[in-house]
Amino acid sequence: MTPKALNAAEVKSLYEKHGSALAAYVCCCGLDFAAAEDVVQQVFLKLLEGRSAPLDSPLAYLYRAVRNASFNLRRDFRREVELAGDEAWLVSGEGTGDEALAVQAALRDLPDEQRETIFLKVWAGMTLQEIASVLELPLNTVASRYRYALEKLRERLQPVARH
């Protein structure tokens, strides 16, 4: 069964609801914000043109599509792209400045695959099953990455929480 293409109103609704979070996710994958916006727009343009369509979950499809597009862009550049200077995606506006800095540092210290899993779970609000679909990994692998990341964050942030 061929997936049905989305109409313009459906694509617009998805963009309005998830465009910013998708761009933040692309920043998590190693691109600056301007490149992240370009990647997200390219994915939505393909949806509008009917060249791609979500198979199961539109949200999981979008995260997988922007992830793949960002990796393709990085590969095409064939150079190291620095993480965006503005790391607003790392923390919400809550907490003290010291706590926010500690969380940013702890997240930066995680291996890329664990940081990506944390982002999708916490900031994108995905289930582990949706994350497995986005990353094209077994559910147990995603669950392990999430658990290990939480353990590392807990160890790293425990001293900060005591102050």
Predicted regions and their residues:
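Acidic, proline/glycine-rich intrinsically disordered inter-domain spacer in sigma factors
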Residues: 9, 76-77, 84-108
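Structural recognition of an alpha-helix C-terminal capping motif at a helix-to-coil junction
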Residues: 38-45, 49, 56-68
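Arg/Lys-rich amphipathic alpha helix in sigma70-family domain 2
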Residues: 64-84
